[in-house]
């Protein structure tokens, strides 16, 4: 590979891949190009920055230059790739171009902001860069509206509440974590947030935002309005597919890849939050770690398909932490729930009596790994 490997992106997926590539080959030319500074930070920490009084710069774990030296890389930070000529094996920015033998897209996902009037007033917390842009406003805000009651919205609601702020959490659904589990399972977290003082607005739709002297007025579809100091969009992520689309690579919800992380073009691969692996978008750390291991080998002639075991997803709500695994979103499961003062175990059983999903909380989380071994996948 005389021209080497180019990775577009600098997040967790890109870094995991770099580490695994260097286990395969210490000298192959390896280039990373990204629109940000390329400094390393732990993205899940963004769910706790307010209660821990952290500034954006406090999140930095390793400077880009140190990473480049450690793994023998060429880095091009603060550069936005404009186009890919897949046939010529060339990546282009506005004023530079690079040739490659193999190209990996690790472009991540962007926070979805609902298309409502006043959407420009909504903040997002999907990167260190985004937090840096709004950290002063969020620290100073006393009244915060979080739009979206999924994983990130629930985590942020607890964090802002722990920091002493007045928090309203809004979602279209009738329960929290509605896309992940039924209400009888998520109700424990819902009650705990309410007990902490979080004001829940469920089955509610945001219609518009407008700047007023006292802050921001949020108007619901019901015409009810509330006044807040900051509004955060936690309404999900959208895989970044624009670059792949321009290159003629197949995209659906994400950049379409097979079990080898290969796109519709034989020398272009995708990994991480931007990738749709055999129809599944898996924006979690463990699938990314495994993807990086398999892809690094396959870039050097390996032929091993990615096999993902049953994996735990951790909800980072420290006052009522949850672990979940399996097909928790399935509507045809029968849930067996044991809830006691020390925690909850909820088992989702199929009609054939097989364990297909589970959710555990608090002190019962220690039983997660034993349950994981009995999970039918």
UniProtKB/Swiss-Prot annotation:
- What GO molecular function terms would the record report? oxidoreductase activity, acting on iron-sulfur proteins as donors, NAD or NADP as acceptor
Question: Is Oxidoreductase tagged as a keyword?
Answer: yes
Keyword Flavoprotein applies: yes
Q: What reaction(s) does this enzyme catalyze?
A: 2 reduced [nitric oxide reductase rubredoxin domain] + NAD(+) + H(+) = 2 oxidized [nitric oxide reductase rubredoxin domain] + NADH
The protein's UniProt keywords, in alphabetical order, are: Cytoplasm, FAD, Flavoprotein, NAD, Oxidoreductase
The prosthetic group or cofactor this protein requires is: FAD
What role is this protein assigned?
A: One of at least two accessory proteins for anaerobic nitric oxide (NO) reductase. Reduces the rubredoxin moiety of NO reductase.
Please report the name of this protein according to its UniProt entry.
Answer: Nitric oxide reductase FlRd-NAD(+) reductase
Q: Report which gene this protein is encoded by.
A: norW
């Amino acid at each position: 590979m005389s021209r080497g490997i180019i990775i577009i992106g600098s997040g967790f997926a890109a870094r995991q891949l770099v580490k695994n590539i260097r286990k395969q080959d210490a000298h192959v030319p390896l280039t990373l190009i990204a629109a940000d500074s390329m400094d390393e930070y732990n993205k899940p920490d963004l769910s706790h920055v307010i209660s821990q009084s952290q500034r954006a710069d406090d999140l930095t774990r390793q400077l880009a230059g140190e990473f480049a030296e450690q793994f023998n890389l060429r880095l091009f930070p603060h550069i936005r790739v404009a186009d890919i000529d897949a046939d010529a094996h060339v990546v282009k920015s506005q004023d530079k171009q690079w040739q490659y033998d193999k190209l990996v897209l690790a472009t991540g996902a962007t926070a979805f902001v609902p298309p409502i009037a006043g959407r420009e007033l909504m903040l997002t917390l999907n990167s260190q860069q985004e937090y840096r842009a709004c950290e002063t406003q969020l620290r100073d805000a006393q009244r915060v509206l979080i739009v979206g009651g999924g994983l990130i919205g629930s985590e942020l609601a607890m964090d802002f509440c722990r920091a002493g702020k007045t928090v309203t959490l809004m979602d279209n659904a009738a329960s929290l974590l509605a896309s992940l589990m039924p209400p009888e399972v998520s109700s424990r977290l819902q009650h705990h947030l309410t007990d902490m003082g979080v004001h829940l607005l469920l089955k509610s739709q945001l219609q518009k935002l407008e700047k007023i002297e006292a802050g921001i007025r949020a108007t619901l579809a019901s015409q009810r309005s509330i006044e807040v100091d900051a509004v955060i969009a936690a309404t999900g992520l959208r895989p970044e597919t624009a670059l792949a689309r321009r290159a003629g690579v197949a995209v659906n919800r994400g950049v379409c890849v097979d079990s080898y992380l290969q796109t519709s073009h034989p020398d272009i691969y995708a990994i991480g939050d931007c990738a749709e692996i055999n129809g599944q978008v898996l924006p979690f750390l463990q699938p990314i770690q495994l993807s990086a291991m398999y892809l690094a080998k396959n870039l050097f002639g390996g032929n091993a398909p990615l096999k993902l075991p049953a994996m735990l997803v951790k909800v980072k709500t420290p006052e009522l932490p949850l672990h979940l695994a399996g097909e928790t979103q399935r509507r045809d499961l029968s849930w067996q729930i044991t809830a006691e003062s020390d925690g909850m175990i909820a088992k989702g059983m199929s009609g054939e009596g097989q364990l297909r999903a589970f959710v555990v909380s608090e002190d019962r989380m220690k039983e997660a790994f034993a349950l994981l071994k009995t999970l039918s996948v």
